[in-house]
């Protein structure tokens, strides 16, 4: 099935754009949602995380204590790699399962770290980047998540640069101050193009 990898920095508007594609009938497979699901109460990853990091990283409801884990992986690169060694294979398994059950004309994989992964570009037919300037990202995430500016800057610094994402892009949606109607029009135009690609793609 024809596939699009949708990516962008934190706060760029990936969820809004993916929801617009979903409303037009594309199958959406969101790796962030899968990551949350496997670390939710009694999620697939939780027994492995508890064994690797200890019970102090498991919240009372059986989910991942995200604040505690975030603090650890920002201060300890090896901890981040240990966490990813647990979560990434499970996320890949789930994305493949969801894509295999897809009913739309094409599938959109929402992958925040698509460029950073080093593997996703080869797994999709097109890369679509939702782009905005860094100050816009920071302001949006501070407002949405209640994070301090320093926290958001640290997250942005760990992600691929804007230039690196744009270099990987086949298609770009600029979302600095775009209205929902403007975004919807851009998505609708891309949707028509992707339907054409999907129809021409070998099964």
UniProtKB/Swiss-Prot annotation:
UniProt subcellular location: Cytoplasm
Keyword Transferase (UniProt): yes
Catalytic activity, EC: 2.7.1.24
Reactions performed catalytically: 3'-dephospho-CoA + ATP = ADP + CoA + H(+)
Pathway stated in the Swiss-Prot or TrEMBL entry: Cofactor biosynthesis; coenzyme A biosynthesis; CoA from (R)-pantothenate: step 5/5
Principal place of residence: cytoplasm
Disulfide bond positions: none
BP terms from Gene Ontology: coenzyme A biosynthetic process
Binding site for ATP: 11-16
One cellular-component annotation, GO: cytoplasm
Keywords linked to the UniProt accession: ATP-binding, Coenzyme A biosynthesis, Cytoplasm, Kinase, Nucleotide-binding, Transferase
Organism superkingdom: Bacteria
GO MF term (any one): ATP binding
Top enzyme category: transferase
Domain DPCK span(s) in chain numbering: 3-201
A Pfam family assignment: CoaE
Annotated InterPro entries: Depp_CoAkinase, P-loop_NTPase
Similarity comment: Belongs to the CoaE family.
Protein function: Catalyzes the phosphorylation of the 3'-hydroxyl group of dephosphocoenzyme A to form coenzyme A.
Protein name: Dephospho-CoA kinase
Species of provenance: Burkholderia thailandensis (strain ATCC 700388 / DSM 13276 / CCUG 48851 / CIP 106301 / E264)
GN (gene name): coaE
């Amino acid at each position: 099935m024809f596939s699009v990898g949708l990516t962008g920095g934190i706060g760029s508007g990936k969820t809004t754009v993916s929801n617009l594609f979903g409303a037009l009938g594309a199958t959406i497979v969101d790796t962030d949602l899968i990551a949350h699901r496997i670390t939710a109460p009694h999620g697939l990853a939780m027994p492995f995380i508890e064994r690797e990091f200890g019970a102090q990283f498991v919240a009372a409801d059986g989910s991942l204590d995200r604040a505690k884990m975030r603090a650890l992986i920002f201060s300890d690169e090896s901890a981040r790699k240990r966490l990813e060694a647990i979560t990434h294979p499970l996320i890949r398994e789930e994305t493949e399962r969801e894509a295999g059950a897809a009913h739309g004309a094409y599938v959109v994989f929402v992958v925040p770290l698509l460029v950073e992964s080093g593997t996703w570009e080869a797994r999709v037919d097109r890369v679509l980047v939702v782009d905005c300037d860094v100050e816009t990202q920071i302001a949006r995430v501070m407002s949405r998540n209640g994070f301090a500016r320093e926290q958001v800057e640290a997250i942005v610094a760990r992600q691929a640069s804007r230039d690196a994402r744009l270099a990987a892009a086949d298609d770009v949606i600029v979302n600095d101050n775009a209205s929902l109607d403007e975004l919807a029009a851009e998505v609708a135009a891309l949707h028509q193009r992707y339907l054409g690609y999907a129809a021409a793609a070998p099964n």
